[in-house]
């Protein structure tokens, strides 16, 4: 079928949210149109861009009728993505951020894997990517978001794949069956000014999926040198808290006993709160902790911050934060956050909790409870 003809019954709908990305969107669309899998539609949701993005989109749409531009007033990522979900006609849905680049053959690999395993979700890895300029060379680092224990398997995440809940959301290195998303009412948070909505979407997918397939291949280049990325924004201090409130609202609106998933969500919340804390300025860190600490304390009092689910290091960090935020801040400033291994864990437990915390962990393990 010629790529110049509008796909009437696409196998896959690719959602591409666009806002002021004139520097990057051309490379993004080129990578999609170069795929050897051709039966797709590209829904490009223009969120009221004020730069030259719209003109670039028109050029591409005039050359390839698989590209459909959806214009809307600027109202944020969540509303844009939900608009795309509502208008998608494909059996499956992929997400491609407008500053990223899809790997060759990625769309075919995702689609064929989904069909082979009758999967609701297919998830793969990706590259961290710096495109380079006149002063720096292009480089890419492979990022393994899929745990080794899940590669090549068909998994029900809530039963035999809990590790995936704690990985970087990366909703764009995946393929989702459209009727699965609609049946489970999986959408994005639409609150004006919201951010990091990928975390909530990611949680809802893993909490709902009965058949998720995980592959080792990297599926796209995730741009790291876009200075306007929301991850780099020092503002939006409390957006991560809003996103977690939405995850809990969605979960508790579903039938069934959610105690275990609420504990999983508790660990996710603490991890995401630490990530948010680390990216903020000193002044904003204080402001954030003034709200985050009571929120975490409420979860602790509900029994949702479970030591066995969180692990000894994170649980000791949590106890330090809730007991003495000032000590937590001093320790976190001194300790390297990228250290790993048994010795690093011992150092972290000692730094945050002292010898008493380390003794507790050792006696728990020697007693066979861990």
PLM-predicted stretches and their roles:
Residues 72-88, 101:
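Glycine-rich, basic loop-to-helix element that forms the pyrophosphate-binding segment
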Residues 93:
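Short aromatic/hydrophobic "clamp" motif used to bind/position activated sugar donors
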Residues 39-48, 68-73, 97-98:
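Short beta-strand/loop segment that forms part of the nucleotide-sugar
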Residues 119, 279-370:
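Membrane-interface aromatic/basic loop that binds lipid-linked glycans or pyrophosphate carriers
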Residues 77, 98-216, 220-237:
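Donor-binding/catalytic cores of nucleotide-activated saccharide
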Residues 31, 46-55, 73-75:
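A conserved acidic beta->alpha catalytic loop
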Residues 1-33:
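N-proximal low-complexity "stem/linker" segments adjacent to membrane-targeting elements
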Residues 10-13, 41, 200:
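Cell-envelope/extracellular polymer assembly enzymes that use nucleotide-activated donors
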